[in-house]
Amino acid sequence: MESEFQQHHFLLHDHQHQRPRNSGLIRYQSAPSSYFSSFGESIEEFLDRPTSPETERILSGFLQTTDTSDNVDSFLHHTFNSDGTEKKPPEVKTEDEDAEIPVTATATAMEVVVSGDGEISVNPEVSIGYVASVSRNKRPREKDDRTPVNNLARHNSSPAGLFSSIDVETAYAAVMKSMGGFGGSNVMSTSNTEASSLTPRSKLLPPTSRAMSPISEVDVKPGFSSRLPPRTLSGGFNRSFGNEGSASSKLTALARTQSGGLDQYKTKDEDSASRRPPLAHHMSLPKSLSDIEQLLSDSIPCKIRAKRGCATHPRSIAERVRRTKISERMRKLQDLVPNMDTQTNTADMLDLAVQYIKDLQEQVKALEESRARCRCSSA
């Protein structure tokens, strides 16, 4: 078949190169009509060809499991004899015989449909290929009324009751184990001895999921227990991590080692020191004012970030001081010069002050001259 396709391809390629270039109507990159006619004849020859017995046997085995399937394992683990022949399923009486059903001769794609009550059916879909007719016996309908089969396919999915038994703490314990443990291996090992008695039998996994890896279940109880073996939970987390007794002792020891020379800031009240919370604030400030002053005297002042608009450069600081002095002197000048508007700018204020000073100087000069000319008569 492939050789015929290649031959037609070469003929088409030669035909396109041998056509005259200056013809009126040119069929660009199109095949001649003779090519498609010969192609149809080759398809008819293939359709008339009967399928092999091995293909018919495999297809009939798939189609017989379409309507009813009581067990998932009977479908997944399809058994064959030692000589390669399929083990025949139990015979069932049929009503309509020799029903012609078109199936694929090359390949089929199976669709596994799982209904709500656990029924599983297989629907072979016709894939790319040529269609051949295969006769099979039609399965009779069952007498009991079952729910309609759902069209949603669940490929490689887990059983319906699997995810309801998964516990968040189990997944967390597995993650902690993969991270190398969280310091709770001893507690896990001792608590696993009572796991088998505390785990209910009703939560065990269904038999259809035995091929998958088992997922453990953890009962939420004060004493952490699980039915996993000790080696599985050896790296799990410790349930007593939030216990204030062990945590406070560790934090207190850590505070003692890190505090160092801060013992001088301890208060004199022994009762209040004994009633401290579990978390020791060893880096907190002392409570008394004298201790705070001593701490501030020993500490080195750190650089504080300048406010917005306040630069820390020496020239900027000098300019800011100069402007501050000018502002103070202008306020004094406003007090000395009468009828000076405070909203006037600095230049106008200076002009008014200069004019006022000149007027004062003229008045002083006139008074001095009048005093010099004045003669007091002696009595």
Swiss-Prot record:
Polar residues compositional bias, start-end: 190-200, 235-261
Q: Does the keyword Disulfide bond apply?
A: no
**Basic and acidic residues composition-biased segments:** 1-17, 84-93, 265-274
Q: Which GO terms describe its molecular function?
A: cis-regulatory region sequence-specific DNA binding; DNA-binding transcription factor activity; protein homodimerization activity; transcription cis-regulatory region binding
- Primary residence: nucleus
Q: Which GO terms describe its biological process?
A: cellular response to abscisic acid stimulus; cuticle development; photoperiodism, flowering; regulation of DNA-templated transcription; regulation of gene expression; regulation of photoperiodism, flowering; regulation of potassium ion import; regulation of stomatal movement
Tell me where the signal peptide lies. Answer: none
Write out the GO cellular component annotations. nucleus
Q: Which CDD domains match?
A: bHLH_AtbHLH_like
Q: Name one Pfam family in it.
A: HLH
Map out region (Disordered) in residue numbers. 1-21, 79-98, 133-156, 190-286
Where located?
A: Nucleus
Q: Which SMART domains match?
A: HLH (SM00353)
Residue ranges of the bHLH domain?
310-360
Gene3D superfamilies for this protein: Helix-loop-helix DNA-binding domain (4.10.280.10)
* Entry-annotated residues carrying Phosphoserine: S74, S213, S234
Q: Keyword annotations for this protein?
A: DNA-binding, Nucleus, Phosphoprotein, Transcription, Transcription regulation
Quaternary organization: Homodimer.
What is the name attached to this protein's record?
Answer: Transcription factor bHLH122
| Source organism of this protein record | Arabidopsis thaliana
The gene coding this protein: BHLH122
